[in-house]
Amino acid sequence: IPNLLAARLSANETAAIATLRNIISSQAQFQQGAKADTDNDGTGEYGGFVELSGGGAGRMAATLNPPVLSGAFRVLNAAGEVSRSGYFFRIFLPGAAGVGVGEPQAGYTAALINSDLVETTWCSYAWPVNYGQSGNRTFFTNQGGDVVATENSAYSGTATGPASDAAFKPADAGKITGSVAIGVVGVDGQTWKQVN
């Protein structure tokens, strides 16, 4: 039984990393195609799961068709999370002064985000639905394209994922526009290590 659990944990973690890499690609495609441009300056903005997956129009004039992310990301729980393969996923976009705003269950509105910062910044976390049973590591990525990981048993279950700034350097506490804590301690007190 321990070997089966270890195999399942490994498979779930591998799937979470692959999903984050898929989100990176989807965000790049969405932003470069200027699917959302709330300030009408001709520069595209990054999106939330509802927008990327075609689950709703969000900040766009119409629902994205075809979507750039799997339809499995159309339904968010009350905490703004999507559950996939033993992991919860959450997107944060920048609000005023670069503060991370988690995606609401119904998706983002223009009033929630900073229309200039969202042209250059987003981040996403993945953490176990049940630490030790569905996964051990928590993962992070953003527009830079790196995936980093840490192990923290507190990141387990719905509404108990990392704060928006958890994987950023302490000097950038409170914001998602700063430097990622790659190989060093982040705002959450954990060391975040790059995943290959």
Residue positions per predicted region:
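Active-site-surrounding "flap" and adjacent substrate/cofactor-binding loops of secreted or lumenal enzymes
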Residues: 155-159
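Extracellular/periplasmic head regions of type IV pilus-like filament subunits
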Residues: 22-144, 151-153, 166, 171-189, ...
